[in-house]
Regions:
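Glycine/charge-rich, flexible interdomain linkers and switch-proximal surface loops
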Residues: 55-70, 118-130
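Compositionally biased, non-globular sequence tracts
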Residues: 19, 139, 143-144
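Short beta-strand/turn micro-motifs at beta-sheet edges
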Residues: 13-17
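Short, conserved loop-to-beta-strand elements that form functional interface hotspots
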Residues: 100-129
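Single conserved hydrophobic/aromatic residue that forms the stacking wall/gate
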Residues: 1-12
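Compact, glycine-rich, soluble single-domain proteins
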Residues: 19-67, 77-92, 96-108
C-alpha cells in the first residue's frame, strides 16, 4: 500500500534526514500477502501517474516529466484496522522483516527507473512535514 503526498521533509532526532524540493512524499506499508510483484507494479504505476498540473491546470504530467523526486517513508500504521473498538490493530501488516525487504525493494526500483529518491529509516520514529498541494493525496494498493 502506498500513499502519495506532494511536499516533503523528514527529521529523525531533530536532524533533517531527507527532503525533496519537487515531487512526492510516499508513505509505504507492506501488508500480509504482498510480494515482489506488488512492489514492482506499484513502482511502475507511480512512475506513470499523471498527477502534476500542466500549464492548463489539469493533472496531466508525470513525476519524470516534471523532473521530480521522491521521499519514501515506511508507515506501517496505514495497515491499521479500526473496525472494532477504539484501539487500532495491525494484524494485516506484513512482518517487520518482509516489510523492510519490500520497502528497500521499492526504493531500489524507484532509483533503477531514474527517480531521484531519498528515504526515511525503516521503523524509526520520525517527524514528517508536508505541504500538500490541492490537497491531493492518492491511495495505491495491489488493487490499484
Amino acid at each position: 500500500h502506498t500513499w502519495l503526498r506532494r511536499q516533503r521533509q523528514m527529521c529523525i532526532r531533530d536532524r533533517l534526514k531527507g527532503s525533496c524540493a519537487k515531487g512526492l512524499l510516499i508513505f509505504v506499508c507492506a501488508m500480509k500477502g504482498d510480494d515482489e510483484n506488488v512492489v514492482n507494479a506499484l513502482t511502475q504505476k507511480i512512475s506513470k501517474l499523471r498527477i502534476f498540473e500542466s500549464s492548463e491546470g489539469k493533472m496531466d504530467l508525470t513525476l519524470h516529466y516534471i523532473g521530480g523526486e521522491a521521499l519514501v517513508i515506511s508507515q506501517f500504521t496505514l495497515a491499521a484496522d479500526i473496525k472494532k473498538g477504539n484501539r487500532p490493530g495491525f494484524s494485516s501488516a506484513a512482518n517487520p522483516q518482509d516489510a523492510n525487504y519490500f520497502y528497500e525493494l521499492f526504493i531500489a526500483n524507484l532509483k533503477r527507473i531514474k527517480i531521484p529518491t531519498q528515504q526515511g529509516v525503516f521503523g524509526a520514529s520520525m517527524k514528517v512535514e508536508l505541504l500538500n498541494n490541492g490537497p491531493a493525496t492518492f491511495w495505491l494498493d495491489s488493487n490499484s
